[in-house]
């Protein structure tokens, strides 16, 4: 199992705030197509872009709701208004994963309509929820969603293939803008390949605008992650060749970050550490690097000796 380094929320809030001015403004409620209504979660911010996208899917009176936002009071007001003005109901509530900005609206939703308490679905369900299995199908008039287990951003992460539109609800694996945070890089890369193999042109992300060319966006994501893996491996190879560090020429995570980015603040380093830690664990799982025992801060990583042919 990969060691998890705590995520530095404060730094990312500062780091990502610069891109807030570059992302498009999205209306609170948008009829994206005749089958998809997007309702923003009311939780806009540098980590969540324009806020969490929640989607009402279908064409009849009964709809599927994908995600529930963070639990902001504005979201339940907005979603209730849409339901009441259009005389529609929710048959299934599908949660892409456990993170609070996707599940936080569940209590308000149940308070609004207690009947929904038996209609909440999530992989690895919490108490009172129902499980989502890989390949499970949810149907309402005008919409057929098939669950696709795609761990990496989170272990329980689910995407949903929308058959009628040849589209994919991508959750947090692929965003409308920028890159997502990864919990397990090895699983994430496998999931990205799995998603790419679906060959779906359109993506409905959990954050950001609709993705009009999903295959191109996923190629960009995969290329970015692979570049970081190659970059870290090259640094460790250079360390061994130069005889830096000790023993096998290994480097600590701090030394790897220093080699990649130069002198940076502690906050920047804390923010970079989780993803780069995942890169190292992926390389270890691929048996390309090893590590010496020790605490996370003192652990030294090194290139494994290649066996002769």
Swiss-Prot record:
Cited InterPro entries? LACTB2-like_MBL-fold, Metallo-B-lactamas, RibonucZ/Hydroxyglut_hydro, Sec-metab_biosynth-thioest, WH-like_DNA-bd_sf
GO terms for MF: hydrolase activity; metal ion binding
Residues recorded as binding Zn(2+) 1, renumbered to this chain, are 97, 99
Catalytic function, reaction form: 2,3,6,8,9-pentahydroxy-1-oxo-3-(2-oxopropyl)-1,2,3,4-tetrahydroanthracene-2-carboxyl-[ACP] + H2O = 2,3,6,8,9-pentahydroxy-1-oxo-3-(2-oxopropyl)-1,2,3,4-tetrahydroanthracene-2-carboxylate + holo-[ACP] + H(+)
Family annotation (CDD domains): LACTB2-like_MBL-fold
Q: Name one Pfam family in it.
A: Lactamase_B
What are its cofactors? Zn(2+)
Q: Which residues bind Zn(2+) 2?
A: 101-102
Phenotype upon loss of function: Fails to produce asperthecin.
Q: Key word Nucleotide-binding present in the record?
A: no
Q: What is its EC number?
A: 3.1.-.-
Q: How is the cofactor bound?
A: Binds 2 Zn(2+) ions per subunit.
- Catalytic residues as annotated in Swiss-Prot or TrEMBL: 101
One GO BP on record is:
asperthecin biosynthetic process
Task: Please give the pathway this protein is involved in.
Answer: Secondary metabolite biosynthesis
On induction, the UniProt comment says: Expression is induced during late sexual development in the dark.
Q: Which UniProt keywords apply?
A: Hydrolase, Metal-binding, Zinc
Q: Which family does it belong to?
A: Belongs to the metallo-beta-lactamase superfamily.
Mind telling me which PANTHER family this protein's record contains?
Answer: ENDORIBONUCLEASE LACTB2, LACTAMASE-LIKE PROTEIN APTB-RELATED
What task does this protein carry out? Lactamase-like protein; part of the gene cluster that mediates the biosynthesis of asperthecin, an anthraquinone pigment. Polyketide synthase (PKS) aptA catalyzes the formation of the aromatic polyketide from acetyl coenzyme A and seven malonyl coenzyme A molecules. Polyketide is subsequently hydrolyzed by the action of aptB into endocrocin-9-anthrone. Endocrocin-9-anthrone is then oxidized into endocrocin by aptC. Endocrocin is likely to decarboxylate spontaneously to form emodin which explains why there is no decarboxylase in the asperthecin biosynthesis cluster.
Which protein are we looking at?
Lactamase-like protein aptB
Provenance organism: Emericella nidulans (strain FGSC A4 / ATCC 38163 / CBS 112.46 / NRRL 194 / M139)
GN (gene name): aptB
């Amino acid at each position: 199992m990969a060691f998890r380094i705590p995520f530095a929320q404060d730094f990312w809030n500062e780091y990502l705030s610069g891109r807030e001015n570059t992302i498009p403004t999205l209306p609170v409620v948008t009829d994206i197509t005749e089958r998809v209504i997007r309702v923003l979660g009311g939780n806009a911010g540098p980590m969540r872009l324009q806020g969490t996208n929640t989607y009402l899917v279908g064409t009849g009176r009964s709809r599927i709701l994908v995600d529930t936002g963070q639990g902001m009071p504005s979201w339940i007001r907005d979603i209730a208004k849409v339901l009441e003005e259009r005389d529609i109901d929710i048959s299934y509530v599908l949660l892409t994963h456990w993170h609070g900005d996707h599940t936080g609206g569940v209590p308000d939703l149940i308070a609004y309509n207690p009947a929904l308490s038996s209609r909440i679905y999530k992989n690895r369900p919490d108490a009172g929820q129902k499980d989502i299995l890989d390949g499970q199908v949810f149907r309402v008039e005008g919409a057929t969603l098939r669950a696709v287990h795609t761990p990496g951003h989170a272990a329980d992460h689910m995407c949903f293939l929308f058959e009628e539109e040849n589209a994919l609800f991508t959750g947090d694996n692929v965003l409308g803008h920028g890159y997502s945070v990864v919990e397990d890089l090895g699983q994430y890369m496998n999931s990205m390949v799995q998603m790419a193999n679906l060959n779906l042109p359109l993506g409905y992300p959990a954050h950001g605008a609709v993705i009009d060319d999903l295959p191109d966006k996923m190629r960009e994501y995969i290329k970015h992650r692979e570049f970081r893996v190659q970059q870290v491996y090259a640094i460790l190879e250079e360390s061994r060749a130069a005889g830096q560090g000790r023993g096998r020429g290994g480097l600590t995570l701090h030394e790897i970050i220093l080699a990649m980015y130069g002198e940076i603040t502690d906050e920047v380093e804390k923010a970079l550490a989780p993803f780069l830690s995942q890169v190292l664990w992926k390389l270890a799982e691929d048996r390309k690097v090893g590590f010496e025992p020790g605490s996370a801060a003192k652990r030294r990583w090194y290139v494994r000796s290649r066996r002769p042919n």
